Amino acid sequence: MPATPDALSIARDLLRCPSVTPADAGALDVLDRLLRGAGFEVHRVTFSEPGAADIDNLYARIGTGAPHLMFAGHTDVVPPGDVSAWSHGAFAGEVADGQLYGRGAVDMKGGIACAVAAVLVYLAACGGQPKGSISFLITGDEEDIAVNGTVKLLQWADARGENFDHCIVGEPSNVEELGDCIKIGRRGSLSGTLIVDGVQGHVAYPQRAVNPVPDIATLIVALSHEPLDHGTAQFQPSNLEFTSVDVGNAATNVIPAQARAKFNIRFNDQHSIKSLQALIEHHLAAACGNRIRARIEWLPSNAGAFVTKPGPFTDLVTAAIEQVTGRRPELNTGGGTSDARFITHYCPVIEFGLVGQTMHKVDERTPVSDLEKLTAIYRGVLERYFA
């Protein structure tokens, strides 16, 4: 019988696929081959959307009973940037000084590799079949607009009658050291553009114009300083941040007709997207009074806030982490959005993977020892889950 591949070899094979979103570049083929070889029933599903790239996705399951534990993740990666700035090839999967280098090493091909390696070892030890079901739900559409990936793959699986009891997303959840953090939720994300209308005119005749620049500055200050909430036991306060201001005016002697400012809000579970939009519109109306003409164009959002309540599943994962690392992880909801926001509608979900310090950076890398430890943690989860 051939030796079971370890996480390092799987990760290197994945890293050598330059799967910059939305390209797959063979990454799902690597997983397809390994999982079919272990007895999984594997499905490859392509989704389309007008104006977006077609995306290949993978769903694999072994076992037919309960409980059903799903591992979820993505094989697409962000661009490497200036490849000449990398000390090792961005898609070479090289190991140097005990570190595995490559775009996606941390986010999140390394985490997927550890999950696959752990499952293969676990299955080999229990005769090839779990006492329940194990599945992998892997997309190539997470780093960009995320419309043809996890959200549709979950709908497809649900239509087939798939039921999940719990899910682990292998995103890089740890801040400083492996085992320091489990993500049990995420804040939501909502973006928009504040638009202030004025009247264009010559700067020498301001009485004949209405300058939107001072007005938008007033509104930016007002909206930035208006508290949205005071946080909760599991979430920090929501925050609104302006990210750009533009008047589309290259001239120095023309008062512009319009000013625009883009912003993003990261919000906790005290708000829904609709209630938050209403709150911001209320604050805007109060700041405008009867003088300023302003409005907001909202961007579509599917990123609501969610939290998985601590309980037996988080306790089980915590125990597996403590056994391997000696650390008791913090349960928190910090960071950006992830595909866990879609999975939470189907089952309780947590995120636990590698350390995220180098994700999206030049020379993204992870210690090989962390790959080994994360594999051991995932195997510990499997042993406890199906005990």
UniProtKB/Swiss-Prot annotation:
Pathway the protein acts in: Amino-acid biosynthesis; L-lysine biosynthesis via DAP pathway; LL-2,6-diaminopimelate from (S)-tetrahydrodipicolinate (succinylase route): step 3/3
Positions bound to Zn(2+) 1: H74, D107, E171
One GO molecular-function entry: zinc ion binding
EC numbers, comma separated: 3.5.1.18
Entries under Gene3D superfamilies matching the protein: Zn peptidases
Key word Metal-binding present: yes
Keyword Iron-sulfur: no
Catalytic activity annotation: N-succinyl-(2S,6S)-2,6-diaminopimelate + H2O = (2S,6S)-2,6-diaminopimelate + succinate
Cofactor: Zn(2+); Co(2+)
Co-factor binding comment: Binds 2 Zn(2+) or Co(2+) ions per subunit.
Residues at the catalytic site: D76, E142 (proton acceptor)
Biological-process GO terms, alphabetical: diaminopimelate biosynthetic process; L-arginine biosynthetic process; lysine biosynthetic process via diaminopimelate
InterPro entries: ArgE/DapE_CS, Bact_exopeptidase_dim_dom, DapE_proteobac, Peptidase_M20, Peptidase_M20_dimer, Peptidase_M20A
Residues where Zn(2+) 2 binds: D107, E143, H360
Keywords annotated in UniProt: Amino-acid biosynthesis, Cobalt, Diaminopimelate biosynthesis, Hydrolase, Lysine biosynthesis, Metal-binding, Zinc
Subunit structure as annotated in this protein's UniProt entry: Homodimer.
HAMAP family, per database record: DapE (MF_01690)
Family named by the database record: Belongs to the peptidase M20A family. DapE subfamily.
Function summary: Catalyzes the hydrolysis of N-succinyl-L,L-diaminopimelic acid (SDAP), forming succinate and LL-2,6-diaminopimelate (DAP), an intermediate involved in the bacterial biosynthesis of lysine and meso-diaminopimelic acid, an essential component of bacterial cell walls.
Name by which UniProt lists this protein: Succinyl-diaminopimelate desuccinylase
